[in-house]
Swiss-Prot record:
Species this protein is from: Tropheryma whipplei (strain TW08/27) (Whipple's bacillus)
GO molecular function: ATP binding; magnesium ion binding; phenylalanine-tRNA ligase activity; tRNA binding
Subcellular compartments: Cytoplasm
Coiled coil found in the keyword field: no
Name of the protein in its database record: Phenylalanine--tRNA ligase beta subunit
Residues involved in Mg(2+) binding: 516, 522, 525-526
Length: 961
């Protein structure tokens, strides 16, 4: 969000304030606070906030007290023992005048006596002050700024009469830095350096230096959203301030434009508008102090009169201007795209290697400026420039934004063009700048120039009172609506052809400076913004009941055996509320207590990220590329390998490189979950809503690794946005790469088509345990991310188990579905190394993502309290030798079935692969317990033998003794 610095005095030039209450008639119906002829900064911010603009006070006057103009009558130089040379000066100043017209004494206390420090009275007494000064850049007769005892300077410095170098200094001669008007502290401020000619001759001793140097002004910072480019100017903010207070607005732009022609411009790439004007006989010497001060408050450094005027008009009107040294232009001007390997030396000393998509203004010798961004040094205006070619253009906002980002150049001009500038003000802003150059730099305005504009008026929008009621939620009369829209510059007329007795229809044409007004919703927002948000009644929230269009997968079991491996059948979970805020909060606390760090990422991603990492519970494994995944990958405890009927499992060469194995197609996108694009994204490169939290976590990990934080275990809890088959008409969104107009009739129904579940995602990379003396370090591995999934299950009060699967964002063979109550709710595993490398991350990055709303619909957080066991347990180890292609989770399931109810717990504690055979040995820790009585060795051995017998019949397993 951009910030505009607005000097208060500059803003108030364009509005007509009145003493007392601002008029209550017209648009606003709420009671406004009192505004005087000169509203303070707080009043301005309050008014702007009422029409949707936030801000804060930036610069307050820090100078106070008797700060006046003095004339140096005489001085004596003295060299002291420390080698420093000082000047013992006699300075004539105007003494403060009391109400009885008698001067204050030299030792008066300004805090107890009031004084008028202006030179409004010719009877004011002039007196001479003795002042010690360490500067030497002034002469006898110079006018200087004197801070008398009792004045306060920036930084909390209080001026008093004190003894310095053996003399009583009755005040201080101030420098630029001490007054806050510059950075020069080497010498004092001489008014002859600030004012010239008639302005200097009118200054008298005793004049109020604060008013003379415009040091009593303050500035406010106003935040400008990307859709309100018109507000990036004093003119735009003044219009909003006048709107908020129902007072007249005075436009600073002239109505008459200057005739110009005869200059040939080759417009190979047609801009929206392009005007030029030749001005000659310029005296580019000194900028008036009032303009320097205003630019300073607006955050712009003074350069020279011509450049300052172009900057001044840009801040005033929002139209960027550029001045070329006309004598430096070779041949005719041309607006074109940059040539391959073309370079531009900019006015700030950089050399840019231009891209062929960059728009430039060039002459016969090459580029003169990067259009809409920055000028070049070859045609820059200097103090010796006598003839300038003034340019006011209007360019495509996207082109300017891309050029600015491409070269990392964020200028005042590019900030305005990227937000769209009113096409119709280019020529008027040019005329405004020409008038200022004529008045302040003695420029001679010629009729030589060029003019081009390509403007198409926005199409009218049909708006009814019913539309406003449907969007806003309350009723307004047609007169209120029309008055509100006219107040923001719209052309509004009644449309009797479409009106009915119940609904009155209007035809609304937005003004040229509001290209953001394109539909009914935009107009409704403006109506309520102008009328006042306090007119919206407070009502109890009513949520319509509807079935959530959620699909899942159910895994069926018959008689303790898998039916056709695992048979997938879509089901719709029962309608229950989604995961609550309290559940999300407790889950976050649980993960944080386990050592994970919570992060919050933006919900906006590019299309590639939206397609790659989508965690789809309806994902079809057959829709992805199935590369050779190598021999038996390591799968943690509880992961069941799933094979197609008739398949013998996973096969492939063992010597294939890991990255070669991981070349899965990452562009697969399920048709039921198209990415939802935004009409007006904050970042043009990230114009889609996320369908997974993993892309944001990958970017977060990259930022942390680039700053030296290499050991990460981070998580996020947030919404993802899953579109349905039909194109969504959600306000501001559309569910395809093309932008469709929003439907007014079924807005609510369209919003319901977008499934927005809460999900939780964990990402881990780096070291799980740091290497220390007597302790070996350990990297995060696949077991850690499965433990993270189990931590999520414990935080939700449910149990998860895992089924091996494939997903385009995960390593083949190192990915598993997360199953809860026979429903597929997410994925966990190792991120595809090629995908991790694209984010400059190491190969070993592990992640899991789980749909919390699905878990909530299945009934989570149902805690079951079990009776504490009263009988002792018996623990035994079991080692089985079996084929490499048999997953540990399958063995655990069979052993549980064979051992029966006596087996309380089993877990894998060791795995050994035989080098010369296709066999492996799995060692399990088994805990037996009888809830009713103490176990005997015979019963334990019998249960163990039954388990071995069943494992042998199922997998050909052999027990090692």
């Amino acid at each position: 969000m951009a910030v505009l610095r607005v000097p208060v005095s500059w803003l108030l030039e364009y509005v007509h304030t009145q003493t007392g209450f601002v008029g209550e008639t017209g648009i606003r119906s709420d009671t406004r606070r009192t505004h005087t002829d000169c509203p303070v900064a707080e009043d301005i911010l309050e008014s702007l906030l009422s029409v949707g603009f936030e801000g804060e006070i930036l610069d307050r006057p820090e100078l106070s007290g008797p700060i006046v103009v003095g004339r140096v009558l005489d001085f004596t130089e003295e060299v002291h023992s420390n080698g420093k040379t000082i000047r013992w000066c006699k300075v004539r100043v105007c003494a403060p005048v009391q109400p009885n017209n008698t001067p204050l004494s030299k030792d008066c206390n300004p805090s107890t006596q009031t004084g008028n420090f202006s030179n409004a009275d010719t009877n004011s007494a002039l007196e001479t002050r003795d002042i010690v000064c360490g500067a030497s850049n002034f002469s006898k007769g110079d006018l200087v700024v004197v801070t008398l005892p009792g004045s306060n300077l920036p930084g909390g410095f209080h001026v008093t009469a004190r003894k310095v170098y053996g003399h009583l200094s009755d005040g201080m001669i101030a420098s630029e830095k001490e007054l806050g008007v510059g950075d020069n502290h080497d010498g004092i401020l001489r008014l002859a350096e600030v004012f010239q000619g008639d302005e200097l001759s009118k200054i008298r001793e005793g004049d109020n230096a604060l008013e003379l140097l415009a040091l009593t002004d303050s500035a406010v910072a106003v935040s400008i959203t990307p859709d309100r480019g018109y507000a990036m100017s004093i003119r735009g903010i003044a219009r909003e301030y006048a709107l908020a207070n129902n007072i007249p607005f005075s436009d600073p732009l002239p109505d008459d434009v200057l005739p110009a022609g005869g200059l040939s411009i080759d417009l190979r790439c047609k801009p929206n508008a392009f005007f030029t004007l030749l001005i000659q006989e310029i005296e580019n010497n000194q900028t008036p102090q009032w303009m320097v001060r205003r630019l300073q408050l607006a955050g712009i450094r003074s350069v020279c009169p011509v450049v300052d005027i172009t900057n001044y008009v840009m801040v005033e009107t929002g139209q960027p201007l550029h001045a070329y040294d006309y004598d430096a232009i070779q041949g005719s001007l041309c607006v074109r795209t940059a040539d391959k390997k073309e370079t531009l030396d900019t006015i700030d000393g950089r050399r840019l290697e231009l891209h062929t998509d960059d728009l430039v203004v060039a002459d016969a010798n090459g580029a003169l400026s990067l259009a809409g961004v920055i000028g070049g040094s070859r045609s820059r205006v200097t103090s010796d420039t006598k003839r300038i070619l003034l340019e006011a253009g209007n360019f495509n906002p996207i082109d300017i934004s891309l050029s600015s980002r491409r070269h990392k150049l964020y200028t005042e001009a590019s900030a305005r063009f990227a937000r769209s500038v009113d096409i119709l003000i280019a020529q008027r802003a040019l005329a405004r700048a020409a008038e200022l150059i004529r008045d302040l730099a003695s420029g001679d305005i010629t009729e030589l120039g060029s003019a081009y504009i390509n403007y198409t008026q926005q199409s009218p929008i049909l708006l009814s009172t019913l539309d406003i009621e449907r969007v806003v939620g309350c009723c307004f009369t047609r007169e209120e609506i029309m008055s509100s829209l006219r107040a923001i510059g719209c052309d509004v007329s009644c449309d009797s052809d479409h009106s009915t007795p119940d609904t009155q229809v209007m035809l609304v044409t937005p003004p040229s400076f509001r290209p953001d007004l394109v539909n009914v919703q935009d107009l409704a927002e403006e109506v309520i913004r102008v009328i006042g948000f306090n007119r919206i009644p407070s009502l109890r929230l009513s949520v319509p009941h509807r079935e959530q269009p959620v699909q899942s997968q159910q895994y069926k079991l018959e008689n303790g055996k898998l039916e056709n491996g695992y048979t997938l059948s879509p089901v719709t979970p029962p309608r229950t509320p989604p995961v609550t805020f309290e559940q999300r909060r407790l889950l976050g606390q649980s993960l944080a207590a386990c050592g994970h760090v919570e992060v919050i990422c933006y919900p906006f991603v590019n299309l590639a990220a939206a397609g790659i990492c989508h965690i789809d519970v309806t994902h079809n494994p057959d829709s992805t590329h199935n590369p050779d995944s190598g021999s038996d990958p390591i799968i943690p405890t509880g992961v069941t390998r799933i094979t197609e009927p008739g398949s013998s499992g996973v096969s492939g060469p063992d010597n294939v490189d890991v990255k070669e194995k991981c070349s899965a197609d990452t562009s697969v996108e399920h048709p039921t979950t198209r990415a939802i694009s935004l009409h007006n994204p904050i970042d043009a490169t990230e114009g889609y809503l996320r369908r997974s939290l993993i892309p944001g976590l990958l970017q977060c990990a990259h930022r942390n690794l680039s700053r030296g934080l290499c050991d990460l275990s981070i998580f996020e809890i947030g919404r993802v946005f899953l579109g349905q088959l039909r194109t969504s008409n959600l306000i501001g969104c559309n569910s395809d790469s093309t932008c469709n107009a929003c439907s007014r009739k079924n807005t609510i129904e369209s919003m319901n088509e977008v499934y927005q579940p809460y999900t939780v995602s964990v990402l881990q990379t780096g070291s799980a345990i740091q290497k220390q003396p007597y302790t070996e370090g350990r990297k995060y591995d696949l077991a850690d991310v499965f433990d993270s999934a189990r931590q999520i299950a414990r935080g939700l009060g449910v149990d998860f188990h895992f089924v091996q699967d494939k997903h385009p964002a995960f390593h083949p063979g190192r990915c598993a579905k997360v199953i809860c109550k026979h429903h597929h709710i997410g994925y966990t595993g190792q991120i595809l190394p090629t995908l991790a490398n694209k984010h400059n991350l190491p190969d070993n990055v592990f992640a899991c993502e789980i749909n919390l709303d699905l878990v909530a619909q299945l009934g989570c957080s149902q805690e079951i309290v079990k009776t504490l066991p009263t009988s002792p347990a018996a623990t035994q180890h079991l080692t089985l030798t079996l084929g490499n292609n048999i997953a540990a989770a399958s063995v655990i399931s069979v052993v549980k079935e064979g051992a029966g109810e006596l087996l309380e717990d089993i877990r894998l504690i060791d795995e050994y692969k035989h080098e010369e055979s296709d066999k492996k040995s799995l060692t399990f820790a088994m805990r037996f317990r009888d809830k009713e009585k103490t176990l005997t060795a015979q019963r334990v051995n019998l249960a163990k033998e039954n388990a071995v017998r069943l494992a042998s019949s199922k997998f050909g397993a052999i027990m090692r003794r």
